[in-house]
């Protein structure tokens, strides 16, 4: 049965405020799952199960699947599609408020468009060892962007600091119900052995990108004494991830020393 048929069967009305766009092409779901290369020993977290197209393919691998879905009106569809699989657990809750996500799991998801930024931060916070996520094409470009590119910014830096990033493939808007206005991109993120305080780090990155066209000297004005001898004439968008981490460490150490 097609995704659109399931929606009609159970009279599900799409909720605009949730940005609901459901993957309807089984071939894309299979391609994503193949790229994940899952084993029965893996624990997989899916954010936004939707109508279950990707969820069903994930369960077929034998991995333990924990699927989050905020919209309980989709429960009948998900239960019909997944009832024969003992290795899937449905959690009807907001992933952004989740408290017991297993650390070191693998995230495989079609990320809800309206909360992509916060969800990417949660992926970092929960320390997923790998994440294969489908996002809006424009968001994918920002995640993958290199220094000097117009799309390089806060999201590029925070994701690339903690993950090796790689583009897998693009997905046409025609593969979704309803058809969104933009195409999507699937990206592969592999966790780096980085030990940084994410809350402090994202605060620093937000600060240096606060006014993107301004130089570091402008954006770091309250902390100029910390960076004495450092060239602050460039803009944040011109710095590599490694250079930003180096500046952050200098800032963090100085603040810790000042607090005793």
UniProtKB/Swiss-Prot annotation:
Q: Does the keyword Methyltransferase apply?
A: yes
Instruction: List GO terms (cellular component aspect).
Output: cytosol
Q: Which UniProt keywords are present, listed alphabetically?
A: Cytoplasm, Methyltransferase, RNA-binding, rRNA processing, S-adenosyl-L-methionine, Transferase
User: What would you give as a GO molecular function for this chain, any one?
Assistant: 16S rRNA (adenine(1518)-N(6)/adenine(1519)-N(6))-dimethyltransferase activity
Q: What's its EC?
A: 2.1.1.182
Question: Which residues participate in S-adenosyl-L-methionine binding?
Answer: 23, 48, 69, 94, 110
Subcellular location(s) per record: Cytoplasm
Give the top-rank taxon of the lineage listed in the UniProt record for this protein: Bacteria
Q: Which reaction does it catalyse?
A: adenosine(1518)/adenosine(1519) in 16S rRNA + 4 S-adenosyl-L-methionine = N(6)-dimethyladenosine(1518)/N(6)-dimethyladenosine(1519) in 16S rRNA + 4 S-adenosyl-L-homocysteine + 4 H(+)
Entry's family note: Belongs to the class I-like SAM-binding methyltransferase superfamily. rRNA adenine N(6)-methyltransferase family. RsmA subfamily.
Quote the function comment for this protein: Specifically dimethylates two adjacent adenosines (A1518 and A1519) in the loop of a conserved hairpin near the 3'-end of 16S rRNA in the 30S particle. May play a critical role in biogenesis of 30S subunits.
**What name goes with this protein?**
Ribosomal RNA small subunit methyltransferase A
The species is Thermotoga sp. (strain RQ2)
Gene name for this UniProt entry: rsmA
């Amino acid at each position: 049965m097609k995704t659109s048929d399931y929606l009609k069967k159970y009279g599900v009305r799409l909720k605009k405020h949730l940005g609901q766009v459901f993957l309807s092409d089984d071939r894309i779901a299979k391609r994503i799952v193949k790229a994940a290369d899952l084993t029965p020993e893996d624990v997989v977290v899916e954010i936004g199960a939707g109508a279950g197209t990707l969820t069903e393919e994930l369960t077929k691998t034998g991995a333990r699947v924990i699927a989050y879905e905020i919209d309980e009106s989709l429960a009948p569809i998900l239960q019909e599609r997944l009832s024969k699989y003992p290795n899937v657990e449905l959690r009807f809750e907001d992933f952004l408020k989740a408290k017991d996500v297993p650390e070191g799991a693998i995230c495989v998801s079609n990320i809800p468009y309206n909360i992509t930024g916060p969800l990417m931060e949660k992926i970092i916070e929960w320390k997923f060892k790998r994440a294969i996520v489908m996002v809006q094409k424009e968001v994918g470009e920002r995640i993958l962007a290199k220094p000097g590119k117009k799309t390089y910014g806060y999201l590029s830096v925070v994701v690339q600091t903690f993950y090796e990033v790689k583009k897998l493939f693009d997905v046409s808007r025609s593969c979704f119900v309803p058809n969104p206005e933009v195409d999507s991109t699937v990206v592969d993120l592999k966790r780096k052995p980085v030990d940084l305080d994410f809350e402090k780090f994202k605060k620093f990155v937000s600060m240096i990108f606060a006014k993107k066209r301004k130089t570091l000297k402008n954006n770091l004005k309250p902390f100029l004494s910390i960076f004495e001898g450092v060239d602050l004439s460039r803009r944040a968008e011109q710095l590599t991830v490694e250079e930003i981490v180096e500046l952050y460490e200098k800032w963090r150490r100085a603040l810790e020393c000042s607090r005793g």
